[in-house]
């Protein structure tokens, strides 16, 4: 039972310490992931535009 109290106390101190620290490296990783998502979104939108134009050309060619 005494070990449990010590464990809870150490976990609480650790959580407080980590919570107040700067998330510099985590923020950098998050920014990189966000950039990848933005590039993927932009490429998808651009690809859909090209596909729509190709479909219009194909429909026009068929008559």
From Swiss-Prot:
<dbReference type="GO" id="GO:0005576">
    <property type="term" value="C:extracellular region"/>
</dbReference>
<comment type="similarity">
    <text>Belongs to the cecropin family.</text>
</comment>
<dbReference type="GO" id="GO:0045087">
    <property type="term" value="P:innate immune response"/>
</dbReference>
<keyword id="KW-0044">Antibiotic</keyword>
<keyword id="KW-0399">Innate immunity</keyword>
<dbReference type="GO" id="GO:0140460">
    <property type="term" value="P:response to Gram-negative bacterium"/>
</dbReference>
<dbReference type="GO" id="GO:0051607">
    <property type="term" value="P:defense response to virus"/>
</dbReference>
<feature type="modified residue" description="Arginine amide">
    <location>
        <position position="62"/>
    </location>
</feature>
<keyword id="KW-0929">Antimicrobial</keyword>
<keyword id="KW-0964">Secreted</keyword>
<keyword id="KW-0732">Signal</keyword>
<comment type="function">
    <text>Cecropins have lytic and antibacterial activity against several Gram-positive and Gram-negative bacteria.</text>
</comment>
<feature type="signal peptide">
    <location>
        <begin position="1"/>
        <end position="23"/>
    </location>
</feature>
<dbReference type="GO" id="GO:0050829">
    <property type="term" value="P:defense response to Gram-negative bacterium"/>
</dbReference>
<dbReference type="GO" id="GO:0019731">
    <property type="term" value="P:antibacterial humoral response"/>
</dbReference>
<keyword id="KW-0027">Amidation</keyword>
<dbReference type="Pfam" id="PF00272">
    <property type="entry name" value="Cecropin"/>
</dbReference>
<dbReference type="GO" id="GO:0050830">
    <property type="term" value="P:defense response to Gram-positive bacterium"/>
</dbReference>
<dbReference type="InterPro" id="IPR020400">
    <property type="entry name" value="Cecropin_insect"/>
</dbReference>
<protein>
    <recommendedName>
        <fullName>Cecropin-A1</fullName>
    </recommendedName>
</protein>
<dbReference type="GO" id="GO:0005615">
    <property type="term" value="C:extracellular space"/>
</dbReference>
<dbReference type="InterPro" id="IPR000875">
    <property type="entry name" value="Cecropin"/>
</dbReference>
<dbReference type="GO" id="GO:0002213">
    <property type="term" value="P:defense response to insect"/>
</dbReference>
<keyword id="KW-0391">Immunity</keyword>
């Amino acid at each position: 039972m005494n070990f449990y109290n010590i464990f809870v106390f150490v976990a609480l101190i650790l959580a407080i310490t980590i919570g107040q620290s700067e998330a510099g490296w985590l923020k950098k990783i998050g920014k990189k992931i966000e950039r990848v998502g933005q590039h993927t979104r932009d490429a998808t939108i651009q690809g859909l535009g090209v596909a729509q134009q190709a479909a219009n050309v194909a429909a026009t060619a068929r008559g």
